[in-house]
């Protein structure tokens, strides 16, 4: 039985809800911060204290931070469309507000969830944490995630906050109600095409493996002030990733579209400019941001997490995806 009291921000999402479930099993007292109007039924069934609030509010609810010594900061504005400032307001200024709600002396750990997306939008072959992310990105989400990482580490260096930064790749798992459902919808309508090479690696991580890494970071004093890349630890091609979903859900398998990457980038740039000009609220079908998912080799090293945290992914890609697809089948 743990004597820690955890605050999980973004607890209504895939990562946050999975952490809440694991924390309850581990005997932690849990406070789950979710936005007003969000469905908190899963969290309530777990028996956690559900607190409603928003990182964009002027002040966070007092009950969210009172008595808390451990924070899992999962909340973020996600997507590939919108102004940089709209993302900064949540992902950077929201983080600042959250950090300022605590005295660093009261904190055991503050685990900040970043993203492998902060690295440069290029092909990656075992890129590790010694490669610094660029200061400028072409989409608001990635730009704000890079800035929030820097802010978290600044609070560690200058104010002594016990920060750990985790950089997960593409997260999949049960209770994902956004990314995989959209991908499945596109598979149904045969909108998914491979760009570049279908053999390019994904940077995927099963949510259970990410939760495992988060708890390893929580209990390791050597993790403080560090950044960790996190994936499933095996090379999974985009073809294998998408085909596994298609076959598992009895959906059409996409075909290879031999379009050079430079042409797709040109089309994406053109579509974005037109969408911005007409003030579109929704992203065009192809954006520069989602080219990373479709057209780049995303292979990152997790040797640092293995060495310092003792991270050894508990589930393989096949096991994690089978669990994920079973959840979708039982839900529908």
What is each PLM-predicted segment?
Residues 146, 159-161, 172-182, 208, ...:
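Glycine/proline-rich active-site loop of Rossmann-fold NAD(P)-dependent oxidoreductases
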Residues 123-171, 192-195:
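Catalytic helix-loop patch of NAD(P)-dependent Rossmann-fold dehydrogenases
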Residues 97-140:
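Conserved Rossmann-fold NAD(P)-dependent oxidoreductase catalytic core, especially the SDR/UDP-sugar
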Residues 5, 300-308, 312-332:
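Amphipathic terminal alpha-helices
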Residues 37-44, 48-93, 101, 116:
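NAD(P)H-binding glycine-rich loop region in Rossmannoid oxidoreductase-like domains
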Residues 6-26:
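N-terminal Rossmann NAD(P)H-binding glycine-rich loop of SDR-like oxidoreductase domains
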Residues 132-135, 165, 185-205, 209, ...:
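A conserved pocket-lining segment of Rossmann-fold NAD(P)-dependent short-chain dehydrogenase/reductase
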Residues 220-284, 322-325:
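Mid/C-terminal beta-alpha module of Rossmann-like enzyme folds, strongest
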């Amino acid at each position: 039985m743990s004597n820690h009291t955890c605050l999980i921000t973004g607890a209504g999402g895939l990562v946050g809800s999975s952490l809440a479930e694991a924390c309850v099993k581990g005997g932690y007292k849990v406070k789950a911060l979710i936005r007003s109007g969000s469905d908190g039924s899963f969290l309530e069934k777990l028996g956690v204290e559900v607190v409603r609030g928003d990182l964009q509010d002027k002040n966070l609810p007092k009950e969210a931070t009172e008595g808390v010594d451990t924070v899992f900061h999962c909340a973020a504005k996600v997507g590939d469309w919108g102004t940089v400032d709209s993302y900064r307001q949540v992902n950077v200024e929201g983080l600042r507000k959250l950090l300022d709600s605590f005295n660093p002396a009261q904190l055991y750990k503050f685990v900040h969830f970043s993203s492998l997306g902060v690295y440069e939008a290029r092909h990656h072959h075992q890129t590790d944490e010694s490669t610094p992310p660029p200061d400028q990105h072409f989409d608001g989400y990635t730009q704000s995630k890079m800035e929030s990482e820097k802010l978290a580490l600044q609070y560690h260096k200058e104010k002594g906050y016990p920060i750990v930064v985790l950089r997960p790749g593409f997260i999949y798992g049960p209770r994902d109600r956004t990314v995989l459902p959209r991908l499945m919808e596109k598979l149904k309508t045969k909108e998914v095409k491979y760009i570049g090479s279908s053999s390019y690696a994904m940077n995927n991580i099963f949510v259970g493996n990410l939760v495992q890494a988060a708890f390893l970071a929580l209990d390791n004093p050597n993790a403080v002030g560090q950044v960790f890349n996190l994936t499933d630890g095996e090379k999974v091609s985009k073809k294998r990733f998408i085909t596994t979903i298609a076959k598992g859900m009895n959906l059409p398998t996409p075909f290879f579209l031999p379009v050079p990457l430079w042409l797709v980038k040109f089309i994406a740039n053109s579509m974005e400019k037109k969408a911005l000009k007409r003030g579109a609220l929704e992203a065009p079908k192809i954006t520069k941001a989602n080219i990373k998912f479709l057209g780049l080799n995303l292979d990152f090293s997790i040797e640092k997490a293995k060495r310092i945290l003792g991270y050894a992914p508990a589930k393989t890609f096949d096991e994690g995806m089978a669990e994920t697809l079973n959840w979708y089948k039982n839900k529908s």
